[in-house]
Amino acid sequence: MTTLGTPLSHHATKVMLLGSGELGKEVIIALQRLGVETIAVDRYNHAPGQQVAHHTRTITMSDPALLKALIQAEKPDLVVPEIEAIATPMLEVLEATGVVRVIPTARAARLTMDREGIRRLAAETLGLPTSPYQFCDSFEELQAAIEGGIGYPCIVKPVMSSSGKGQSKISGPADVQKAWDYAMAGGRVSHGRVIVEGFIDFDYEITLLTVRAKGADGQIETHFCEPVGHLQVNGDYVESWQPHPMHPAALERARHIAKTVTDDLGIAVDGQASGLGIFGVELFVKGEQVWFSEVSPRPHDTGLVTLTTQWQSEFELHARAILGLPVNTALRNPGASAVIYGGVDAKGIVFDGVDEALRVPGTDLRLFGKPESFVKRRMGVALAAHADVEQARVNAKLAASKVKPRAA
């Protein structure tokens, strides 16, 4: 039996989110609906999740001393990482010494904080199919890797980055220097390390939202949402839709890959397979073939579409799973999402055209409330529900196009 407390009381169930962007904001809302006291942590003030949480804290989460002091002071029941740039070795120490439980596990947070940890786990430890790859610490190593077997075309990404930052496609020798320089500018750390991947000629890519949750007998079960199709431009999601049709054999392989990697990431530092929550498993598909790409041990940006498609969104699934509650991954109706970009570099943004956007049939909006806009910063998302998923895509993109952010 799961017992939950009352917020702002001595018996509250307290959850701390490390990273409070648009995904964290929705997780916080889902937790609050279940009576959980929430603490939103981010590197800057007034982050989206901080706008709705019971408590807010602003620190450099990659600083182990600051992170340890904050967790010891707040004493949350659960710590939920929402981003990669966190002092994950400290989380492992705190989890191992019983100070706090990390979702899904501190080990998963460490392994997925950069592309190297998770790629080596998937390909070298678990033997999952991936694109050919090599890690490089210099421009010369990158050149040698490409010429020595990776070949053209190929994809270069910083080992630590997100939302496509620093990622580019290399079509020939003339592109290598530009790609290296772009990767160095887009990575999260100052030292230069990249992954170069051989290009897979895939038909489409999906996110398979995979949930580890407790069943009625207390044992951990794996649940799958319907496949989420998505379109990425330079590694950054611009639209997603659900369900994406798949050949039954490809879907079976996708689920096998997703379960294999999430089972492993569910193993805590003590060796127990205790990790709970949702994972966004990204996969390439060609016919009946499936390749592992990446995994996030948390809600996924492409999964924003589930706000309009599922009985329980990915955020509600995450909240329920980590609290030990039952989950329902069933589809309610087909739908789609389309990103609303900032379009301008400015602090203090207003949005024109919201009324026009919501006149598109079956649509809804989420405006994230980010205090500063950049031209390519994700400031909101349009959602559309329709019995025909292709029409939902049209409607979502139309609604998104009506919203015009501008400086106040």
From Swiss-Prot:
GO terms for molecular function: ATP binding; magnesium ion binding; phosphoribosylglycinamide formyltransferase 2 activity; phosphoribosylglycinamide formyltransferase activity. Pathway: Purine metabolism; IMP biosynthesis via de novo pathway; N(2)-formyl-N(1)-(5-phospho-D-ribosyl)glycinamide from N(1)-(5-phospho-D-ribosyl)glycinamide (formate route): step 1/1. One of its GO terms (biological process) is 'de novo' IMP biosynthetic process. It catalyses: N(1)-(5-phospho-beta-D-ribosyl)glycinamide + formate + ATP = N(2)-formyl-N(1)-(5-phospho-beta-D-ribosyl)glycinamide + ADP + phosphate + H(+). It is an enzyme of class 6 (ligase). Its EC number is 6.3.1.21. Transmembrane segments: none annotated. InterPro entries: ATP-grasp, ATP-grasp_carboxylate-amine, ATP_grasp_subdomain_1, PreATP-grasp_dom_sf, PurT, PurT/PurK_preATP-grasp, PurT_C, Rudment_hybrid_motif. Belongs to the PurK/PurT family. Involved in the de novo purine biosynthesis. Catalyzes the transfer of formate to 5-phospho-ribosyl-glycinamide (GAR), producing 5-phospho-ribosyl-N-formylglycinamide (FGAR). Formate is provided by PurU via hydrolysis of 10-formyl-tetrahydrofolate. The gene is purT. It comes from Albidiferax ferrireducens (strain ATCC BAA-621 / DSM 15236 / T118) (Rhodoferax ferrireducens). N(1)-(5-phospho-beta-D-ribosyl)glycinamide binds at residues 22-23, 82, 301, 370, 377-378. This is Formate-dependent phosphoribosylglycinamide formyltransferase. Residues 120-323 form the ATP-grasp domain. ATP binds at residues 115, 157, 162-167, 197-200, 205. Keywords: ATP-binding, Ligase, Magnesium, Metal-binding, Nucleotide-binding, Purine biosynthesis. Pfam families: ATP-grasp, PurT_C, RS_preATP-grasp-like. Homodimer. GO terms for cellular component: cytosol. Mg(2+) binds at residues 282, 294. It comes from the Bacteria.
